[in-house]
């Protein structure tokens, strides 16, 4: 199953003019007996990054937690949110990895392949590989993320002194293009604006599912 999806990932630019850019975020708790996934997507104007739409979804009873297969657990909830989202983005930045994944199929790549939409992985931590060379403290500082002798992503710092994010190809974008979009959508926070707003939206979904607690 995983190799079939991984073989369909396109790591080159096949995207049109982007007028609406999306952000996607999903979260689940490892030991939750309900196996609930809380997901959200936002649609933002480009280049203004004004919020045009937002949709959330909760999916219960999915796959158990399996290391390396988290995308298969969380993507179904993102698909439900996608169905409710308007307008539809021409490019989606996903909170999580794309090709920077031990199976070459992180959540950003899986979502992109299933929807056949250009996606970019924007992760907050490293799953595999190491950052090679120095990574400066200034906003915009970059260094390659390398695994098994090949570059699988780029670490970039969007805010001076903040922890970097780790950018990788999701689907239908090249790594240079992915990096360019992440850099251009930074607005002074650690995360690029699409995934930052998607993270906040997913937190709203979780609070709503919990009856407003937290």
Question: What label would you give each PLM region?
Answer:
Residues 1-9, 75, 80, 133-214:
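C-terminal binding/interaction regions
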Residues 24, 94-95, 121-123:
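Short beta-strand segments
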Residues 31-88:
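A glycine-rich, hydrophobic loop/mini-helix early in the fold
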Residues 7-17:
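A short acidic-Thr-Gly-centered motif at the start of a beta-strand
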Residues 101-151:
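A contiguous pocket-lining binding segment that forms or flanks enzyme active sites
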Residues 78-111, 115-117:
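Catalytic-site beta-strand/loop segments enriched in glycine and acidic/polar residues
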Residues 64-69, 94-102, 162-169:
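Flexible, glycine/proline-enriched loop segments at strand-loop-helix junctions
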Residues 19-30:
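Two-metal-ion RNase H-like nuclease active-site motif
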């Amino acid at each position: 199953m995983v190799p079939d999806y991984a073989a369909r990932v396109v790591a080159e630019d096949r995207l049109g003019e982007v007028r609406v850019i999306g952000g996607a975020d999903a979260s689940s708790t490892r030991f939750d007996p309900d196996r609930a996934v809380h997901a959200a997507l936002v649609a933002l104007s480009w280049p203004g990054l004004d919020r045009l739409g937002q949709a959330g979804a909760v999916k219960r009873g999915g796959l158990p937690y399996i290391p390396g297969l988290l995308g298969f657990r969380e993507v179904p909830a993102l698909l439900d949110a996608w169905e409710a989202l308007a307008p539809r983005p021409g490019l989606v930045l996903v909170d999580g990895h794309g090709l920077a994944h031990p199976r070459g199929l992180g959540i950003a790549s899986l979502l992109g392949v299933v929807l056949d939409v250009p996606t970019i992985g924007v992760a907050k931590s490293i799953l595999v590989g190491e950052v090679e060379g120095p990574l400066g403290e200034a906003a915009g500082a970059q260094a390659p993320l390398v695994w098994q002798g090949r570059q699988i992503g780029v670490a970039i710092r969007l805010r001076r002194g903040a922890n970097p994010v780790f950018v990788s190809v999701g689907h239908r974008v090249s790594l240079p293009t992915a990096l360019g979009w992440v850099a251009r959508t930074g607005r002074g926070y650690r995360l690029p604006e699409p995934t930052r707003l998607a993270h906040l939206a997913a937190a709203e979904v979780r609070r709503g599912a919990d009856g407003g607690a937290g």
